[in-house]
């Protein structure tokens, strides 16, 4: 309650000075409208104030305007305008703008893909301490994208991101340990996956669950596997949703619950996991965890069959006879 009152007062002060023409206040008021600080979120109103701040020469406003135009958030999508504002902010040293411009070059978003140019801007942002850019620069050197592959040049950038507590960097370190050489270092991988998982990084949560499930790098623990599969599944990782469904279906690490299994098979099936589509079809076919519905069964068997899942072909032939 008190915090809400303070946020509202803060927003009112920003508005007062923004309306008096103070550019910093205009930018801050725009942020309030983006994040819903002391006011209901309103992307269009945010863009209005960011434009005012941008006109007064606030580089951070240029950066945010670039994001808004690229995403179409609060304004009609316009890639050319978005890139213009991002580049303007990047050239003025805004680290986030430098990173976003690098991403545009890396993925060819709104301009021709240019990995060399991407590395140039990643390096500028990384040099200012932005952990996202430090990680991407590590990956570029690690896999030779835009620069010659050089693990000795790569590693310090990963360490810089790790020292800042960046969850995705923890995951990258774990991944590197897991797949290092012929045998890897699974125990070290689990250590880093766990660090990233606890910070909420979904792919690390999934990989940690797999380690607990299969006893790789740690003692097998079905209950912990279920816990981390669920965490990753709730963040939309399709493979985790499929594995979580299997936990509920078989009572592995959690009490058997076929209705919950169907829920997660459905989530994974919607994301295109062929085996989840088959299993969902099976549940509809035999009324396992859900009311029997042969029409739905055929629908999901067919989706799995279209991806080459052989068992689905057999089940379809049986139902369509």
Regions found by a protein language model. Name each.
Residues 152, 161, 193, 293-310:
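TPR/TPR-like (Sel1-like) alpha-helical repeat modules
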Residues 19-22, 35-37, 42, 55-59, ...:
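Short helix-capping/linker turns of helical repeat alpha-solenoids
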Residues 17, 52-53, 88-89, 124-125, ...:
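Canonical positions in the second alpha-helix
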Residues 2-6, 306-321:
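Terminal, low-structured helical/coil segments at or just beyond the last alpha-helical repeat
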Residues 28-35, 63-71, 75, 100-107, ...:
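Hydrophobic face of amphipathic alpha-helices that form TPR/SEL1-like repeat modules
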């Amino acid at each position: 309650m008190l915090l809400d009152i303070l946020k509202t007062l803060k927003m009112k002060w920003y508005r007062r000075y923004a309306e008096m023409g103070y550019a910093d206040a205009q930018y801050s008021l725009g942020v309030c409208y983006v994040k819903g600080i002391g006011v209901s979120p309103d992307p269009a109103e945010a863009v209005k104030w960011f434009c005012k701040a941008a006109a007064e020469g606030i580089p951070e406003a240029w950066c945010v305007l670039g994001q808004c135009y690229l995403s179409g958030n609060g304004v009609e999508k316009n890639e050319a305008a978005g890139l213009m504002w991002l580049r303007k902010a990047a050239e003025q040293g805004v680290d986030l703008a430098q990173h976003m411009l690098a991403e545009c070059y890396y993925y060819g978003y709104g301009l021709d893909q240019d990995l060399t140019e991407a590395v140039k801007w990643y390096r500028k942002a990384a040099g200012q301490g932005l952990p996202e850019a430090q990680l991407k620069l590590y990956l570029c050197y690690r896999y030779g994208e835009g620069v010659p592959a050089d693990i000795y040049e790569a590693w310090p950038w990963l360490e810089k991101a790790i020292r800042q507590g960046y969850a995705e960097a923890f995951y990258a370190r774990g991944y590197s340990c897991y797949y290092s050489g012929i045998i890897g270092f699974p125990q070290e991988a689990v250590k880093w996956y766990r660090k990233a998982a606890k910070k909420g990084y979904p792919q690390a949560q999934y990989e940690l669950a797999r380690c607990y499930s299969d006893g790789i790098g740690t003692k097998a623990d079905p209950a912990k596997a279920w816990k981390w599969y669920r965490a990753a599944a709730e963040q939309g990782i399709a493979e985790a949703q499929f594995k979580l469904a299997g936990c509920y279906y078989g009572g592995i690490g959690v009490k058997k619950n076929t209705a919950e299994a169907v829920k997660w098979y459905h989530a994974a099936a919607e994301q295109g996991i062929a085996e989840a589509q088959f299993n969902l079809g099976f549940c509809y076919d035999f009324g396992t965890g859900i009311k029997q519905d042969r029409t739905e069964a055929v629908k999901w068997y067919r989706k799995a069959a279209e991806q080459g899942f052989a068992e689905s072909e057999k089940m379809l032939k049986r139902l369509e006879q």
